[in-house]
């Protein structure tokens, strides 16, 4: 999504700091340590600032439900199981995914500074929000960051109709002379959160996103939630590359779930369930170990400019680079506030009443 400043009457703008404080207030009331609550809040607010409504504050209910049900450990003993100069295997002890992810990426950054490459894999975690959050942590340090996670089964493999794969996102961020390059994508056509947005708004989904329980392409969001499945990136069949999205999803499961000794998407559970066992993969490359950082920035910026200034199709206003829309949307929302859908705002105020804190 790219916001230029206009939102319709179904949205209420909330200042970033007010939304951040609200999330921290809710989580600390439930017993989450303040430092951890701030990490979760920062992740959710960044998603909303960047226009990723599917992974923003609308996710708070999922985390609250997970905490109340006992599916999330509020005081996890996040520990290193195995470690070497350039790698580590982490056990998240069923903690909040954002906290496990943040600490894992911090460790990967440290190892990359020391050795040139840092790889940290985490198991026994929970949903960690937007993958790009962690990749950007490395880019802000002048490094290349890669982040992946598996997730509960929501996607059918090419040729199948059963939910076996997760939406299994991949993110890569790299520094440039301007804002970082940021690729942040699900390996399904869309993440499940986008369907949740359509469901709240009572809208049909675009054709090609998902199938129903019989395996037929559907635009009815309830058919997807009632036994249907999302399609892998590339869509139905192999003609437009659905098998490639399917393969990318498997890659994420191999690197995060299987390599960590955890589990793969078919056996990952929802946040509200005990032992959801989400697994993450983080990799950091210290550019200075290969070429000077300024040379890297010069070359990547030149590449981006050459792409953006190339001949455009007449139906498009401009050629975008990955992450660019998010940074422009962030500038708008930092000035005007974050637009929150009215039904989501009502849900957030219900959460506030439920836990006994001041609402929005």
UniProtKB/Swiss-Prot annotation:
One of its GO terms (molecular function) is L-malate dehydrogenase (NAD+) activity. GO terms for cellular component: cytoplasm. GO terms for biological process: tricarboxylic acid cycle. Disulfide bonds: none annotated. It is an enzyme of class 1 (oxidoreductase). Its EC number is 1.1.1.37. Its main location: cytoplasm. It is found in: Cytoplasm. It holds the Pfam family Ldh_2. InterPro entries: Mal/L-sulf/L-lact_DH-like_ah (IPR043144), Mal/L-sulf/L-lact_DH-like_NADP (IPR043143), Mal/L-sulfo/L-lacto_DH-like_sf (IPR036111), Malate/L-lactate_DH-like (IPR003767). Belongs to the LDH2/MDH2 oxidoreductase family. This is Malate dehydrogenase.
């Amino acid at each position: 999504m790219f916001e230029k400043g206009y939102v319709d009457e179904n949205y209420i703008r909330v200042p970033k700091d007010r939304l951040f404080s609200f999330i921290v207030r809710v989580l600390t009331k439930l017993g989450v340590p303040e430092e951890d609550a701030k990490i979760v809040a920062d992740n959710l607010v960044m998603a909303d600032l960047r226009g990723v409504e599917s992974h923003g504050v609308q996710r708070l209910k999922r985390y609250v439900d997970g905490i109340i049900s006992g599916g999330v450990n509020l005081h996890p003993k996040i520990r290193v199981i195995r470690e070497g100069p350039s790698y580590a295997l982490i056990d998240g002890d069923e903690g909040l995914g954002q906290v496990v992810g943040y600490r894992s990426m911090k460790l990967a950054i440290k190892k990359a500074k020391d050795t040139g490459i840092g790889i940290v894999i985490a198991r026994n975690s929970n949903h960690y929000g937007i993958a790009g959050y962690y990749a950007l942590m490395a880019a802000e340090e002048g490094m290349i960051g890669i982040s992946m996670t598996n997730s509960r089964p929501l996607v059918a493999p090419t040729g199948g109709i059963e939910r076996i794969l997760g939406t299994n996102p991949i993110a890569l961020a790299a520094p440039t002379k301007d804002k970082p390059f940021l690729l942040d994508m699900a390996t399904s056509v869309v993440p499940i959160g986008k369907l949740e947005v359509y469901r709240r708004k009572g809208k049909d989904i675009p054709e090609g996103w998902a199938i129903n329980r019989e395996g037929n392409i559907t635009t009815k969001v309830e058919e997807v939630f009632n036994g249907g499945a999302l399609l892998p990136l590339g869509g139905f069949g192999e003609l437009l590359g659905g098998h490639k999205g399917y393969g990318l999803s498997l890659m994420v499961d191999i690197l995060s779930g299987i390599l960590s000794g955890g589990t793969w998407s078919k056996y990952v559970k929802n946040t509200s369930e005990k032992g959801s066992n989400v697994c993450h993969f983080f990799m950091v490359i210290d550019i200075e170990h290969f070429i000077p950082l300024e040379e890297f920035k010069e070359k990547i910026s030149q590449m981006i400019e050459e792409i953006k200034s190339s001949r455009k199709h007449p139906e498009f206003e401009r050629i975008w680079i990955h992450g660019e829309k998010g940074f422009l949307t962030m500038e708008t929302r930092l000035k005007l506030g974050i637009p929150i859908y009215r039904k989501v705002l009502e849900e957030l105020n219900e959460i506030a009443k439920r836990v006994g804190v001041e609402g929005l």
